[in-house]
Swiss-Prot record:
It comes from Escherichia fergusonii (strain ATCC 35469 / DSM 13698 / CCUG 18766 / IAM 14443 / JCM 21226 / LMG 7866 / NBRC 102419 / NCTC 12128 / CDC 0568-73). Keywords: Cell inner membrane, Cell membrane, Ion channel, Ion transport, Membrane, Metal-binding, Sodium, Transmembrane, Transmembrane helix, Transport. GO terms for cellular component: plasma membrane. It comes from the Bacteria. Its main location: membrane. It is a multi-pass membrane protein. Coiled coil: none annotated. Na(+) binds at G75, T78. This is Fluoride-specific ion channel FluC.
Amino acid sequence: MLQLLLAVFIGGGTGSVARWMLSMRFNPLHQAIPLGTLAANLLGAFIIGMGFAWFSRMTNIDPVWKVLITTGFCGGLTTFSTFSAEVVFLLQEGRFGWAMLNVLVNLLGSFAMTALAFWIFSASTAN
């Protein structure tokens, strides 16, 4: 269990630093679209897709590596990667309605929670 915790810790830290570096490098290039964040999300989705595909075939891989790369690195780089993988799994299972609902709930829910947080913060600091 300690090895798994350390794997998440190391992978998460590394992914977070990678995301920060991408943001510092690419976000200033375009005012309306944070290109570094987009790159982190797309890269994380690609890595987790490759990771899950690879780990499903390489069943003898130590679980520490799986957790380091997927939960740790991709989780630190972006949580969008996990969401993307879950939608792809639903699509592969032929559960198209659930996949689309998952997309709507995750995206709209995330936007709504962000807006709610901004509203709560603004309301609490208005006076």
